[in-house]
Amino acid sequence: MRSKELIILADSSPDSVVEKAIKMGLKVAAVDQSVKERLKGYLDPSLIVEVSEWPSEGELTLFKIRGPEDVEILRREANERKFLIESESWKIIPLENIIAEVGGERIYAIADDLEEARSLLGVLEIGVKGVVIPIKDSAQLERALRLSEEVNPLNLREARVTEVKQVGMGDRVCVDTTSILSKGEGMLVGGSASFLFLVHSENIESPFTSPREFRVNAGAVSNYLLAPGGKTLYLSEVRAGSEVLAVSVDGRRRAVSVGRAKVERRPMVLVRASSDGEEGWTVLQLAETIPLVKPDGSTVAVTDLKPGDRVLVYVSERKARHFGTAVDEFIEER
């Protein structure tokens, strides 16, 4: 699944929204020269996507489609530069024609709203490479970030288990969602917010228990849990009504609501692992029904886990957290 870009159109968005978008990791596009200059006054220019109108060439070339002859021009030129498409009437059909001919890797489109953005990102199941969209307020910006998460998978990677150690009794949290979790779906949890383990849901059949397709036994109350917007929650904070991320083995993610957080005292096990020089750990309940996920998508129960086994993890570039939000500062967790 190739990555997609959701870019904020600065020309039609308040400066406060533009600044917040940058902090959330979204790019900003500017078409009007005065807007470009204003943004350069308080933003790093590298964060601004330069847009130039056809036939001038910028990071993105704005091209207006008025009729079939314009589609023909795009077919000829699309391999030479990245185009930002603006259509005065029909949007989907012209883009379908372009994507069918040249693919969507160098094609971007202007969307009027988030629903249209979602449609454009999925044209012919390939979709455009990115959408440029005006955002009016913080609520819209949050929804835009959710959409960006939906269409961009997390980069899960392989980690080698280095230690499995029983650590006595502790309080663990079962996160019961209001959704049915599919095979291969679970949640990302860990003792460090920058190194999270994929814990599979309890939707696997066993001789002794019925499956709980809505549940992830996420471990100790002190564990971090990945939530929408790139934020984390302590498991102790999760309760009915919280929103968390369900993550699949291929990195796809979706927001799900919590119907209940079930805290009970159980025997616990510490699992440590390393990946490309990074180290992390998690504390989970010691039981046959708590599975981690292997790189091939199969599962391994924590009761069967041993040093040398390989499991899937997510390692974040940003290490520090302030009330669950990633920040760029030094922090050491151990």
UniProtKB/Swiss-Prot annotation:
It is an enzyme of class 1 (oxidoreductase). The keyword NAD applies. It catalyses: 2-amino-2,3,7-trideoxy-D-lyxo-hept-6-ulosonate + NAD(+) + H2O = 3-dehydroquinate + NH4(+) + NADH + H(+). The keyword NAD applies. Pfam families: DHQS. GO terms for biological process: amino acid biosynthetic process; aromatic amino acid family biosynthetic process. Keywords: Amino-acid biosynthesis, Aromatic amino acid biosynthesis, NAD, Oxidoreductase. Belongs to the archaeal-type DHQ synthase family. Catalyzes the oxidative deamination and cyclization of 2-amino-3,7-dideoxy-D-threo-hept-6-ulosonic acid (ADH) to yield 3-dehydroquinate (DHQ), which is fed into the canonical shikimic pathway of aromatic amino acid biosynthesis. This is 3-dehydroquinate synthase. It comes from Korarchaeum cryptofilum (strain OPF8).
